[in-house]
Amino acid sequence: VRIAFWSSWLLLISLSIGLALALADFRTATHYASAPLLLEPGTQLTLETERLLPGRPQLSLTFQRPPPDYDQPDPVLGNWQNSQHAGFLRFRTPGEPIRLKVEHDGRHAIYRAMPVSSHGSGEVTREFTPDEPSASPTDFQWPPLASPLTLGAGNLHLKITVVEVGPGLRGETATLGLEPGLQMKVTDADYGWLWLLFIVKPALQLLLALYAVVMLAWSWRRGRTWWRGRAGAVKAS
């Protein structure tokens, strides 16, 4: 019984340490960085983030707007309605241009905003893709070009500069976001099983908590038995 008791405690401690380390990696891998960005040519900001593994930046701009009306597309922010051609998408309403220069680790690349691709309660989002200087304003390569920049692992600082912004958006402040490497819907295969924590994290935490409660109850019963045995021995003497 004593061996089983201490083995169970050792297993609980090992599982707790393992889960804590996995959750720390999960928090880093799912870290979403964001900052307000004034849309004026020449505006600069430094975006701080952390990554568990190297990867390519996925940038987006979120605007405070009501959900889009697909019957009356917003000419400023654009609309995702498009026609697909060989190697590219042609958008009916691409939105006014936004180009950002991203600098990291001595390298830089220009990114171009696509039309509104998602929306939530009171906000809409435009995602960025590597710029194609010779492309028509309505055309975007599809699948998108591979990002020319690669972000390393650890704590990072990205310098962002507004290169171009359409007149209908100048002076507006939007939220610049840098997506994490590990996401619920889209993730890199290098993260392996860590993606499963999106689904099983609450269950694992609950099971470990129940295991701890059982061990505490078992320890209390063993302690009470030990004290009773000691008290009986004292009386007998």
Predicted features along the sequence, with ranges:
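Hydrophobic membrane-insertion alpha-helices, especially the h-region
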Residues: R2-L23, Y211-A212
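Extracellular and analogous surface-interaction loops
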Residues: P41-R56, L145-L156
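Extended, hydrophilic extramembrane loops/domains of integral membrane proteins
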Residues: L149-K185
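C-terminal interaction-tip segments
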Residues: A174-L204
